[in-house]
Amino acid sequence: MSNLSIQLLKALEPWRNARAWHVAFSGGLDSTVLLHLLAQLRQIHSLPPLSAIHVHHGLQAAADAWPAHCQALCDDLGVPLQVVRVHVQAGASLERAARDARYQAFVALTQAQEVLLTGQHRDDQAETFLFRLLRGAGVSGLAAMPHQRGLGEGDLCRPLLDVPRAHLEAYAQEHNLSWIEDPSNVRTDFSRNYLRHEIFPLLTRRWPQAAASMARSASHCAEAQGLLDELARQDLQEAGSVSEFDWLGLQSLELAPITSLSPARQRNALRHWLAALGLLPDTDHWAGWDALRDARADAQPVWKLAEGQLHRAGGRIWWMAGDWLRQPIAPMQWDNPLLPLALPGNGQLQLLGQAPGGSLQVRYRQGGEVMTVKNRGHRDLKRLLNEQGLPLFARGRLPLLYVNEQLLAVANLPGLDCSPCGRWQLQWLPTKSDQGLS
């Protein structure tokens, strides 16, 4: 076996027992060499079933001939090929939109215990590092492309990431491989192409090992980010106490353990926490965290992000997104209380036990409501909610059950959610706040 084959087999060792290997096959040099290497290796090694995926973006006329080229090579190698046509959304960055469309297709086609293999190499890693450096990225961004990560229900692996492009070219020439040269790759109005064709030749003439050095720096940053993530998990463990209002279904953290940290550790912990919800705020936007953290104790500060918000209430910070940012629709008649009632944009409501008689209606708080409480008589709802400590942001979404225009119960709040004699209980299952940042 060639050194390149040995290096590839070693990189793929953790996935030798996967259900399938899919090669992201553009038809270019990188993916052509990767597919050819794998097709040769499977002749002498027991490997998972191998297939190829070609994504047709439909962005240029030349691309219409590429599926046929890919099919011919796959036929020669005996590898099944799937061609997927995607629609690229118009936007400011055509490169990013095409990448997003491509990876959406890959996510849909990669099942559990399956691996998508891509052909990025060391020169690509160096370009990514420099591109992000010029955009002012932090340690996480400068870590560039990881060797592996999750992809939908499966995994993505870049087994050639430590291999220089020159080695791939030499392999292709040795085996008389032909590949597609994308005409758009010479357009220097694309940022990556500008770096590849204008900047890197200058750098490598002065520093021949520039690409290798940048890739090594990216590896150092990845290791540093791993330590930062480990520290963040430790700090978040201190703040991850259970709230009495966990039934709201919202992600939340106890504020005091976070604010006891240094400002840098606060941001590190919150970056790690918010990363699971989507894109992180940029450097200038972190002033919103300072304002939320330092607001008066009796204030209700909000940090507004792209598609979500952080609220501070009850000594905690709460992540809200999606339906939680929209006013639910009310009132609603509940004609059959034996069945759960779907609340538009607000989950569902159900009555446990023997339903009360009369005309049932569900409303939301408007202000000035009064209800009768066992052994306490008539009480203002506002005072009752204050006694319960329910966060203000949740009060306008809390379902109120009326019978013949009388406020009878408040969902989920002990002592207010059931009949005086215990014949029934009002239970609310809120909508999930699962929409992340954009």
Where are the predicted features?
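Core alpha/beta nucleotide-donor-binding catalytic domains of modification enzymes
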Residues: M1-P201, R206, E230
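AMP-forming adenylation/ATP pyrophosphatase catalytic core
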Residues: L4-L29, S51, H57, V86-V88, ...
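A broad structural signal for alpha-helix termini and local helix breaks/kinks
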Residues: T110, W207, L274-G278
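Residue-level detector of well-ordered alpha-helical segments, enriched
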Residues: Q125, S213, R265-A269
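Amphipathic alpha-helical interaction segments
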Residues: Y194, E198, R216, N268-A269
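Short amphipathic alpha-helical segments with coiled-coil-like heptad repeat character
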Residues: R206-Q209, F393-R395
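Substrate-binding/catalytic subdomain of NAD(P)-dependent oxidoreductase enzymes
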Residues: A211-S219
